[in-house]
Amino acid sequence: MTQQAATMDTADGPCFAHGMDIAHQVVVFDAAELEPESTFWAGVLEGEVDVEDDWHMITVDGAPKVGVQLAPDHVAPDWPEESRPQQIHLDLYVHDFPTAHEKVMALGARVLKEAKDATPNADFQVYADPAGHPFCLCIIT
């Protein structure tokens, strides 16, 4: 295995893993309602929603970034409770926490755990998207 095949490049270039050329890497969320979930992530990423019957793809500058698939029986995680634990979450590292917080709240997020210390590199705040999937805004410099 070559050094190139063992590492993943950034989104700007091809992604090689064990000789496999991956054109796009997309996180997919299940949701009982596609519109609020895809609209939320399109707003967060400043992208557009490509709509199909039971699938929405959020693209940014024409590149697929997040998928939302219809899951009529989707039950939101109940974080931090363990009755319905999270299975995946995104960490979004932001330079301007107050602006990012205002944006995700306006798009329909809700706070699950407030930051203890809203200073750069010190903390993070946990939110849920409209379908209940946890994600974090991580404060950086």
Regions from the language model: what does each represent?
Residues 73-79:
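A short, acidic/glycine-rich surface segment
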Residues 1-9:
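Extreme N-terminal basic, low-complexity initiation segments
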Residues 32-34, 85, 90-130:
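Vicinal oxygen chelate
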Residues 61-63, 83-87:
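Short connector loops at helix/strand junctions that flank enzyme active sites
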Residues 19-21, 28-71, 106, 112-122:
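Core segments of cupin and vicinal oxygen chelate
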Residues 9-38, 44, 88-92, 138-141:
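N-terminal beta-strand motif that seeds the catalytic metal site of vicinal oxygen chelate
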Residues 58-62, 127-130, 140:
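Active-site beta-strand termini and strand-to-loop segments that position acidic
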